[in-house]
């Protein structure tokens, strides 16, 4: 069997709620908690949990002859912890096989460079 290593980047952004001019000074909650929860539960059920179960099955079937790497953003980890902790457990089970490596990842995927070079430098420094 040829050497094979899969790399998966795991990221879940926070969803923003509709925020109008009239909300300024009245409501400072920018994130849509219902959307964050609903989307996380859906992608956990349809994507993360089935894929991690499949990878675990294949690692066992092929006796660890391939490797998998994950980089998981901080926003994804925060949402897994809040809404779908079983996803974190599924990653732990994969890491325990010795065939899975966790790589460094940024907390979020900022677009600050589009608006402010100074802010971008602050975030990556």
Q: Which residues are covered by each model-predicted region?
A:
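N-terminal regions that are enriched for targeting/export leaders
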Residues: 1-63, 68, 96
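Metal-dependent polysaccharide deacetylase catalytic core of the NodB/CE4 family, i.e.
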Residues: 68, 72-125
């Amino acid at each position: 069997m040829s050497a094979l290593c899969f790399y998966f980047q795991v990221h879940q952004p926070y969803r923003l709620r509709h925020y109008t001019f009239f909300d300024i000074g009245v409501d400072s909650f920018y994130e849509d908690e219902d959307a964050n929860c609903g989307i996380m539960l859906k992608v956990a059920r349809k994507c993360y949990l089935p894929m991690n179960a499949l990878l675990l099955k294949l690692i066992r079937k092929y006796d660890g002859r391939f490797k998998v790497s994950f980089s998981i953003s901080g926003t994804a980890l925060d949402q897994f912890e809040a809404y779908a902790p079983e996803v974190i457990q599924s990653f732990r089970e994969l890491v325990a096989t010795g065939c899975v490596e966790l790589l460094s990842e940024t907390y979020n995927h900022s677009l600050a460079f589009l608006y402010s070079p100074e802010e971008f430098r602050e975030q990556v420094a």
